[in-house]
């Protein structure tokens, strides 16, 4: 589906890298190809190779999604410029994003500090600002000092050192797998873990009643009564506390504790992960 090409000295002489790209393009015209010297022309080859591989891996899906989105807007009469948020806190043209989709990989977490800065300015808050963004899969936290959003080149997809280095400038937002849909599980050593696997929106937490049967952070909150199952989303969505109890009970049996104790442990570990972010 895709190919990443990274030769060690292509930033000095890109002839061989370009030639490989041309050969592959001729032989496989539908193949998504990323050349490292075009994407991230730096001497540090590990960072360059990592960013090239990430870009190539997301390119087939992102190109189709972004270009289809643009076509849909055009068909509906939209004549403006369609922009996509980027990992460095800015925006880029949708066609540019489809050619270099890696720049959108951390665009979600990057927008929280941008919004946080804007809100702080409206409130005339001048002190350091901690911005928190939590969803179904991750808990993201960033810091704004003196009105400046911190940018880093040390961003990892997944765990630091064991995940994949982005290798490009991005907003410095720390992410941990402690979202509402993060799944609680027991590792080989018998310790309780949260995430990074998530139930996501579908099938979702067990209490959603949409097919999920694994214990999540949201299920634990429902079991303990922290979330009112009858007034979720202002009453627009009813949650199934029985399903949440059943999901958490499986974990409780493994830990040999009560369901309430297991639910409390899930939230405790989740909260500790957020604090350590």
Question: What role is predicted for each listed range?
Answer:
Residues 1-277:
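N-terminally biased helix-coil "hinge/interface" segments that flank
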